[in-house]
Amino acid sequence: MASDVKAMTQVVSPPASAAAKEIGGDVARKVRATAKKTMDDVAMTPFLRKITFFSSGGSFLDGYVLSLIGVALTQIVPAFGLTDDWSAAIGASVLVGIFAGTIAGGYLTDIIGRKKMFIIDLVAIGLFSLLSVFVAEAWQLVAARFFIGVFVGADYPIATSLIAEFTPKEHRSISMGMVSAAWYLGATVAAVVGYGLYGMEDGWKWMLGSAVVPCVVLLIGRHDIPESPLWLASKGRVAEARAVVDRVFGPDVELAPAKPAGKTPLATLMRGEYLKRMVFLGVFILCQVVPMYAIYTFGPEIMAAFGLGEGHEAILGESAVSLFFLVGSIPAMFWLNSMGRRPLLLMSFALMAAGLLVLGLWPTAPVTVIILAFGLYAFFSGGPGILQWLYPNELFPTEVRATAVGVAIGFSRIGTIAATYGTPLALDAWGVGPVMLVAAGLVLLGLVLSYFLAPETRGKSLAETSGIDDR
């Protein structure tokens, strides 16, 4: 009988170790249930998606206004009797503006906040787009395009800082990928609009003025997006920051990250580890965007040089390349989390260079080969295209984040100004093959630089990625 009771006790009573684990599990679950989450740990909500969507609008406008000028120039040049120098100046003027706008806009955004600049720039872009319709001389168009570039450039650090500071870490690459995809979407829409208006008398006026439409849509969508709580907290406005967190995330979410970043003077960007990061970003972004900007700004001319037709046919060729850029950015959003930032960047640069080398070494190839080579380059531009926005926002603290984005993007635009001005001249002097080889050389330079300097930031909070002892 005693043995039966003992056996029953052994069956019913769990082992001591199992009971301890069960108790420990209960305690852990209670701790997790009562512990507050940080902004990095929450799930994406419809309002957070709205912030990402409308913050990406500035990137859409950049792709739109930059690409549409390539189509518009095919009408503007004969209408105004422009030389290659004037054509190049019109194409490059927006990039000069972007250079000035990214640096000044980033600095002002860190001083007066994301929200105010978020609205001002859209109003200005719409105004100067309208003025472009009424220009009577080439210099007036250069001036209007310059100021459009200033405010498009200012939107880069504003919008991407806002996205980075609102988005949970697991969704940051996808949200920033939306910025890159929006650029390519804007360029693709521009090609479609340009194709539709190409046959109209004074169609170029409608093309340039059409940028007002997305400006109005974005203004409506942005009007209720709040100030960044991280920026507010960095300025000592903790009560306002807490109110924004309660409104957007809920009262159970903590304002400060688990590992808060220290105060970072602006001068810190110009020395030590942050200077190293700044140099990497400036050169990496330059190598990524210079060939792309040249292709978009003078797309119809480049397509014609490859024998893909002229007029509507060349615009269709540019549209096909734009579609490859857009499609390539979609899987890259997810590869940045699954593969990591660094491996995807290295793989992408290698395959981009391969496509450009084919174009440079075999410019007389069959049309199918030309399209596939352009497609290879454009498709794998998706990863670097996202990282040009993601890396600057991850690698610098809140106090100087927008400034860092502005300086990095602005530095890269020095190369795009020279390349965009020089592309029509180089096409005329050298031909399309050597121009593509120069582009391939730039991409290979980006590959080598990234091999030695590109960091891995996957799965880390902004406080961790912006610290100087993470790598």
Give the residues covered by each predicted segment.
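Transmembrane-helix signature of 12-pass secondary carriers
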Residues: 2-471
